[in-house]
Amino acid sequence: MQNDAGEFVDLYVPRKCSASNRIIGAKDHASIQINIAEVDRVTGRFNGQFKTYAICGAIRRMGEADDSLLRLAKTDSIVAK
């Protein structure tokens, strides 16, 4: 919901799983959110930006979290294909 100034005023904004596009509920305590830093290709130093991925508990329970993160990192060109 937005107020008259156009600002979001909701108390809870649900996240979506980056791998399965499912909504991560408030009671999904097995879900994770991970930030992967972007580094400069020449110097190898952190350039101040990162990619955020959210993985729901169902993906983690199936043991697919590592494959999902690798697939997402490849599509964002963080990991070489």
Curated annotation (Swiss-Prot):
Can you name a GO cellular component term?
cytosolic small ribosomal subunit
Q: Which UniProt keywords apply?
A: Cytoplasm, Endoplasmic reticulum, Ribonucleoprotein, Ribosomal protein
**Gene3D superfamilies, A to Z:** 3.30.1230.20
Gene Ontology MF: a single term? structural constituent of ribosome
List the GO biological process terms: cytoplasmic translation; endonucleolytic cleavage in ITS1 to separate SSU-rRNA from 5.8S rRNA and LSU-rRNA from tricistronic rRNA transcript (SSU-rRNA, 5.8S rRNA, LSU-rRNA); endonucleolytic cleavage to generate mature 3'-end of SSU-rRNA from (SSU-rRNA, 5.8S rRNA, LSU-rRNA)
Subcellular localization(s) per the UniProt record: Cytoplasm, Cytosol; Cytoplasm; Rough endoplasmic reticulum
The superkingdom of the source organism is Eukaryota
Function as written in the Swiss-Prot or TrEMBL entry: Component of the small ribosomal subunit. The ribosome is a large ribonucleoprotein complex responsible for the synthesis of proteins in the cell.
Q: Its quaternary structure?
A: Component of the 40S small ribosomal subunit.
Query: Which family does the similarity line name?
Result: Belongs to the eukaryotic ribosomal protein eS21 family.
Name of the protein this chain belongs to: Small ribosomal subunit protein eS21
Name the source organism: Danio rerio
